[in-house]
């Protein structure tokens, strides 16, 4: 929250630095810009999704670190949407249900916004935590990464801002890159980022079957850093996007 307050203060300083007779116009323009793009936040999985939990929650393997991905995804997504809206952006949860909404239905929801608002006025961020194994043991894989669909798209540009933010907030953690196609993000044919009409990325926020990673992402500090990282990436991307228009 400290970073959000800081952003608000910086925003107000920018506004009040203008001439007094320009204040109203500047404020209107800034608020119009911030609400121009629909930011859809997808909280992956649901209460009825099989697996998607720590080895302790799956089979009782020590250490005792309970974790259900659907709960964690929703906690991060809820706070992210709240804080983006608080600073004037048009952010919305894609899934408000607690059950697992199918990928087809999620994609249809996104594409409905694309048809109504124009696909260039919508972005999708799908939030997940990662896993290497099947929940029967603690694994060694660690780190943060983001995925886009195959090929060169605007999604790659969004991912660049996420990797920049990840390097800032997770400087002491492993960042997982794939430079084989000339950019930093990983690519995959994941249904929701492949079939949505708008730019879309999927973030994998460390491994819940790695002991050190799960301790981090379930801590107050870890959650705060993950939320702040997403906010910084989204805001910086949109500010640069506006400048290119």
What spans do the regions from the language model cover?
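Loop/turn elements at helix/coil->beta-strand transitions in domains of secreted/extracellular proteins
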Residues: 36-37, 86-91, 117-124, 172, ...
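Extracytoplasmic/secreted envelope proteins and their assembly/folding machinery
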Residues: 74-81, 104-107, 156-163, 190, ...
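Short, low-complexity, charged amphipathic interaction modules
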Residues: 1-20
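Solvent-exposed loop/turn segments at secondary-structure junctions
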Residues: 45-48, 96-101, 129-135, 151-154, ...
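Active-site histidine-acidic residue metal-binding/catalytic motifs
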Residues: 19-109, 133-134, 140-142
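Active-site-adjacent substrate-binding region
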Residues: 155-183
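Mature extracellular/periplasmic domains of secretome proteins
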Residues: 104-120, 190-195
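Active-site-adjacent mobile loop/cap segments within catalytic or ligand-binding domains
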Residues: 39-42, 126, 133, 178-245
